[in-house]
Regions:
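Helical element adjacent to the flavin cofactor pocket in flavoenzyme catalytic cores
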Residues: 58-101, 106-111, 258-262, 266
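C-terminal catalytic lobe of FAD-dependent flavoproteins
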Residues: 69, 77, 122, 130-174, ...
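A broad structural signal for alpha-helix termini and local helix breaks/kinks
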Residues: 25, 46-49, 127, 206, ...
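Dinucleotide-binding Rossmann-like beta1-alpha1 core, especially the glycine-rich loop
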Residues: 1-45, 164
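Flavin (primarily FAD) binding-site architecture
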Residues: 114-129
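Helix-loop-beta segment of a Rossmann-like dinucleotide-binding subdomain
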Residues: 3, 23-25, 43-81, 107, ...
Length: 270
């Protein structure tokens, strides 16, 4: 649900138009279309939702995933298909002739695919291979709160244009996310500042505020922002492919486009 309050940065007509287009451009779907819910209905669903200034909200459908479990499943599928996995093996260097150098040995392959994610350009740099792209890395942190979540929400951060999510998660409440620039070599973990930022945003919309003592756990992930050498001012969260000899580099990407990206990489292998 996306609640609309008096003074919200996104007005009802704008959100409604966007969700109408979202529903109709998506084509056939097993999911119900977006609908407007009154303030009374929202408060019946969640009595702890902030009532002051609440006009109502739009209910819409979306998906939820466990990225860690999905990644492990993909690895298992690769193993079942005959792939040999080397876990906890640091790649020291690669080259454009098919060599992969790890700590204690080297391998020669017909093709090498660099899917280092946020570290793809770092691997090229330490291998002495020029990159046509630059990656900046952005950390997104999350809180898992010791409270059941009766309703999933998409909410505005107070005094900002940013949005954040409050979602049911394994019997608890998941709150996220932040957007903080960081270096690829830095620890990927939720900072105290991010913790306080998310708690304050969450507490703005509840009549039963929580404190740091109510946090079950925190976690963070790192997203690559892709910059082209041709236009270093423009960033994107999409992906790009680059081929140099026997080496195929994948820059950027995200889970929602992973399958389409995999098909394009497969075409490069033919």
């Amino acid at each position: 649900v996306l609640p609309i309050y008096q003074g919200s940065q996104r007005q009802r007509w704008l959100v409604g138009t966007g969700l109408f287009l979202y529903d109709h451009l998506a084509g056939k779907s097993i999911l119900p279309p977006a609908q407007w819910l009154t303030a009374e209905t929202l408060l019946q669903r969640d009595p702890q939702l902030k009532a002051e200034g609440l006009l109502g909200g739009y209910a819409f459908s979306d998906g939820q995933m466990d990225d860690r479990r999905l990644a492990l499943w993909v690895a298992d599928q690769a193993r079942l298909a005959g792939a040999k996995l080397h876990e906890h093996s640091d790649v020291i260097a690669i080259d454009t002739h098919g060599h992969v150098h790890i700590a204690d040995s080297s391998y020669l392959h017909d093709r090498v695919i660099n899917v280092g994610g946020p570290w793809a350009v770092t691997l090229l740099k330490q291998s002495g291979i020029p990159s046509p792209y630059r990656l900046d890395t952005v950390r997104g942190s999350h809180l898992v709160l010791e409270r059941e979540c009766p309703q999933a929400y998409l909410l505005e951060v107070p005094e900002e244009r940013r949005i954040f999510f409050v979602l049911p998660w394994q019997g608890k409440t998941l709150v996220g996310t932040t957007e903080v620039r960081q270096q690829a070599h830095e620890p990927i973990e939720c900072s105290v500042a991010e913790r306080d930022y998310l708690l304050a945003a969450y507490n703005h919309y509840t009549t039963a505020p929580l404190s740091a003592a109510n946090i079950n756990s925190t976690f963070a992930g790192m997203r690559p922002l892709l910059y082209s050498a041709a236009d270093p001012r423009k960033a994107t969260r999409e992906y790009a492919l680059d081929r140099q000899g026997q080496l195929i580099n994948v820059f950027g990407g995200k889970w929602t486009t992973a399958l389409a990206l995999a098909h394009k990489v497969q075409q490069q292998l033919l």
